[in-house]
Amino acid sequence: MQDTLSSPILAGQTAVVTGGASGIGKSIVQRFLEAGANCLAADLNEEALAALKEEFAAYGDKLDIARVDVSDRDAVEGMVDRAVDMYGQMDIIVNNAGIMDNLLPIAEMDDDVWERLMKVNLNSVMYGTRKAVRYFLDRGEGGVIINTASLSGLCAGRGGCAYTASKFAVVGLTKNVAFMYADTGIRCNAICPGNTQTNIGVGMRQPSERGMAKATTGYAGATRSGTPEEISAAALFLASDQAGFINGETLTIDGGWSAY
């Protein structure tokens, strides 16, 4: 049986990954490169992008980097155009970029937090997915969309109000797209990581006491934190032809936390 984690199962394909300079996104970029794909890593952090390019210099032009504000529709659409111009095609898009909300319950949340979370966590996914679907339809060969949702897109008590709402919406968007375009060869799935060792929580300098207490119920001692490599392994599988009949799925990767 072919080893999906070390063989070039994406050879000849091109992938775009947002939030691709760190954490889960960086690990997905590495997995895809190792699997033979060309990859455009998009991120807001220019220093992290430069470090990524240097770290993976052995891949040469197979890795392209682009500073992209995913809350900007034109920037997201331009990102896809750049990948197509660079490599002649795009076969896979991973809408991975996201931010958190300090676990704020609704009574502690202001409008700015809500609007920022929706722009980055939801609008960006819609922009990337819509652009990809239009491109795939024009090309007529199908394609793969992977959206990073979260355990908070399935379990309402694992995050703040805005974060949870944004991730539930990502799950709904994913399933709708999968069903609407299933007859075109387009597959759209979501990965739903639980607690993972990444830098997404760096911005949570003052998490809500109520939110933290509620969100971590049942977690202490239940399971360890996941690693970006464990999440990216699932993304690679979903991107490959071995997942050819998997569409509209939400793949939970949480070590059993959601079983509580």
Sequence positions of predicted segments:
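Canonical Rossmann dinucleotide-binding motif of NAD(H)/NADP(H)-dependent dehydrogenases/reductases
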Residues: 7-40
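Active-site helix of classical SDR
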Residues: 129, 166, 174
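Short, small/polar-rich loop/turn modules that mediate ligand/substrate recognition or access, typified
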Residues: 182, 187, 246-248
